[in-house]
Structure formats: C-alpha cells, structure tokens
C-alpha cells in the first residue's frame, strides 16, 4: 500500500532530494549534536591530511543518512562513491569499487546490513589495513594476492543496526544516530525546500506541514509537494495554514501525522486485543501487513511519540493512544505482571 507518510524513498523523492540536498554542514538543518561532532572530526582530519575514520550512520528511513554522507564528502573536498549492500553481490564487486577509489575518497554503502558474509570478509582488511586479498586463478593453481588500497573513508548507513555483525560494527570509529526531527526544525526544512522549489508557502503553512510530517524530512518535503498541488488547484497557489489543513484532510493525514495504517494499527490493538500486549506476528496478520513493514516503518514513530510500547510479551497501546483515538482506556493486565500473580 502506498502511503503519503511512508518514509521510504520513491523515485520522485530521489529526484527532488538531489535538487534540494544541502552541500555544507551549515545548511544541514537539525541533528545538532551530529553536526557539531562531525564538524570537529572533519576539521581535525583535514588538518592532519588523513582519511576520516569510518562512519556508521543509523536511524529510521528518511532522516538524512544519504544526505549527511554527501555533506561529509563535500566538506572533506573529496569524491563520493554511492552504492548499497544488495548491489554488492560478490567479493569482486566490492574489490572493483575499492580499487577505483582515489586517496581520501568516501565510499557510501546504504543498507550495509545486507552485505553478504563473503563480501564482509573482504571489507574487514580494507577498513583496517587498506588492503584486500583477492584470489587469482582456479583450482590447485589458485593463489591469493594482496592489493594495497589508497586511504579512504567508508560510510555505512542502516535502519537496522541489530542486523549488523559485531566484527563489522566494531570497525567503525565514528557512530552517529539520527533522531526524529522537532517540528521547529522540520518547519525550517519546509521553508528552505519551498524557497528552492519556488513554492509560495507562509510560515504558518510550513509549520502545519511540519507538524504532520512524523519528524521526518523526506515526509515533510513530500507533503509540501502534495499541498502545493492542492494550493494550485483549489486555492490561489499560496500555502497558508488553512490550505495546508484542507490538503491534509484530503490526504487523510491527521494532526499527529497518522494515516489510515497508523490508526488501524492502534485500533486493532485497542479493539481486538484489549490494548495489548499482542505479538508482532499476530498484529501483522490482523493488518495483512508484513512484519518488517510494521517494525521498520510504522512502529518507530508511534513508539518515539509514546503511543505504543514494546514489552517482552508484545505491543501495548498507551493511554496517549486511547486519547488520540478518543477512547477510554480499559482495565488490562500489565505486560510486566507475573502470570502466577493472576491466580
């Protein structure tokens, strides 16, 4: 199901993001602790004329992991090579990428948790010693040779750090977690994007869009484009708070940034499972959605905003969820209660 507030990138998102992507850290809005730390690391690295330590960036989709990698490369004054874990199928694919790097270049691997074990084995010495071992020939005549690599920086991005192997995770000297954005930072991003795209958007209109963007710049920019469409057809082209609210009503995105799937999830837990706890498999089956979709796309924002909690026994709707759905909380067994205490 296509969702207007899905944080996964569409082709339209990717095309637009290239045009509005900031180049410098000064233009990278939000994520202040990350910006401040990376600014120090980059300045120190340039002063020493070294390659920046390898960087792992993780967090939910749409928060700017790819954008941050472009900014880092730009600030370092080096080239960025972009690829993804699923694309690197064989050790030879990775070797080809690494041997074509220039000194101090940045190699960005998105979805790095999806690298195969064979490819990871090649990556370890490349990260540690700037060397790779490759096999020449076949059968009894096969032999291993070492190839020296120029100093480089690997930036890995992932939405699922739990799927990274410990040896790979431990080889990153810099680890940055991207958090959901505040409405204020998102409003600044909306205003900046509107200026670049020549969209007439008031401060109040930008704030209304930001409030419903689930803390995610990609969603904020997508909503901005859809509200622009509405403003051009149903209004005079300017995005005011009234126009933004009317457009959101048409898109069925409420003030909390929830769409029908979010509301269905909360309603299902509340109405069919008495508020929980309920296991993720049962929940996915009830909603006819994949477990991974719920865990990676839907739940993170609901949990971060306090509408849902994960416990050892399953998911539970909070009192805040009941309030959002205009329902009265029910008496329910605590997820932390010892079953023997019930008798």
From Swiss-Prot:
Q: What class of enzyme is it?
A: hydrolase
Q: Where does DNA bind?
A: 291, 310, 315
Which Pfam family, any one of them, does this sequence belong to? RuvB_C
Catalytic reactions on record: ATP + H2O = ADP + phosphate + H(+)
Q: What protein name applies here?
A: Holliday junction branch migration complex subunit RuvB
Q: Where in the cell is it found?
A: Cytoplasm
Segments for region (Head domain (RuvB-H)): 255-343
**Source superkingdom:** Bacteria
Which sites bind ATP? 20-21, 62, 65-67, 128-130, 171, 181, 218
Give the domain section of the comments: Has 3 domains, the large (RuvB-L) and small ATPase (RuvB-S) domains and the C-terminal head (RuvB-H) domain. The head domain binds DNA, while the ATPase domains jointly bind ATP, ADP or are empty depending on the state of the subunit in the translocation cycle. During a single DNA translocation step the structure of each domain remains the same, but their relative positions change.
Gene symbol of the encoding locus: ruvB
Residue ranges of the region described as Small ATPAse domain (RuvB-S): 182-252
One GO MF term attached to the UniProt entry: ATP binding
Q: Name one GO cellular component term.
A: cytoplasm
Q: Which CDD domains match?
A: AAA
InterPro entries in the cross-refs: AAA+_ATPase (IPR003593), AAA_lid_4 (IPR041445), DNA_helicase_Holl-junc_RuvB (IPR004605), P-loop_NTPase (IPR027417), RuvB-like_N (IPR008824), RuvB_C (IPR008823), WH-like_DNA-bd_sf (IPR036388), WH_DNA-bd_sf (IPR036390)
What does the record note on quaternary structure?
Homohexamer. Forms an RuvA(8)-RuvB(12)-Holliday junction (HJ) complex. HJ DNA is sandwiched between 2 RuvA tetramers; dsDNA enters through RuvA and exits via RuvB. An RuvB hexamer assembles on each DNA strand where it exits the tetramer. Each RuvB hexamer is contacted by two RuvA subunits (via domain III) on 2 adjacent RuvB subunits; this complex drives branch migration. In the full resolvosome a probable DNA-RuvA(4)-RuvB(12)-RuvC(2) complex forms which resolves the HJ.
Q: Could you tell me which NCBIfam families the record lists for this protein?
A: PRK00080.1, ruvB
Lineage of this protein's species?
Bacteria, Pseudomonadati, Pseudomonadota, Gammaproteobacteria, Lysobacterales
């Amino acid at each position: 199901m296509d969702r207007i507030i899905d944080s996964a990138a569409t082709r339209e998102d990717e095309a637009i993001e290239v045009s509005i992507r900031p180049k410098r850290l000064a233009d990278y809005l939000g994520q202040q602790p990350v910006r401040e730390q990376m600014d120090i690391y980059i300045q120190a690295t340039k002063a020493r004329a070294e390659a920046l330590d390898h960087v792992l960036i993780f967090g939910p989709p749409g928060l700017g992991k790819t954008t941050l990698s472009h900014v880092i490369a730009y600030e370092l004054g080096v080239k960025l090579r972009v690829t993804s874990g699923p694309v690197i199928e064989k050790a030879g694919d990775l070797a080809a990428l690494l041997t074509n790097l220039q000194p101090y270049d940045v190699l960005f691997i998105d979805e790095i948790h999806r690298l195969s074990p064979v490819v990871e084995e090649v990556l370890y010495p490349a990260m540690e010693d700037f060397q790779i071992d490759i096999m020449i020939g076949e059968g009894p005549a096969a032999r291993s040779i070492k190839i020296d690599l120029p100093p480089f920086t690997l930036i890995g991005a992932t939405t699922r750090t739990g799927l990274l192997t410990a040896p790979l995770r431990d080889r990153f000297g810099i680890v940055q977690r991207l958090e959901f954005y505040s409405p204020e930072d998102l409003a600044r991003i909306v205003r900046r994007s509107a200026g670049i795209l020549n969209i007439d958007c008031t401060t109040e209109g930008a704030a209304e869009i930001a409030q419903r963007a689930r803390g995610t710049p990609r969603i904020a920019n997508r909503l901005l484009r859809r509200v622009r469409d509405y403003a051009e057809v149903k209004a005079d082209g300017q995005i005011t708070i009234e126009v933004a609210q009317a457009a959101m009503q048409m898109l069925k995105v409420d003030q909390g940034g929830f769409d029908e799937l979010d509301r269905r999830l909360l309603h299902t837990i509340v109405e069919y499972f008495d508020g929980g706890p309920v296991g993720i498999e049962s929940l996915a089956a009830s909603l006819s959605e994949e477990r991974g979709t719920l865990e990676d796309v839907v739940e993170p924002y609901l949990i971060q905003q306090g509408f849902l909690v994960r416990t050892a026994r399953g998911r539970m709707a909070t009192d805040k969820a009941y309030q959002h759905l205009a329902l009265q909380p029910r008496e329910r067994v605590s997820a932390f209660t010892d079953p023997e205490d019930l008798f």
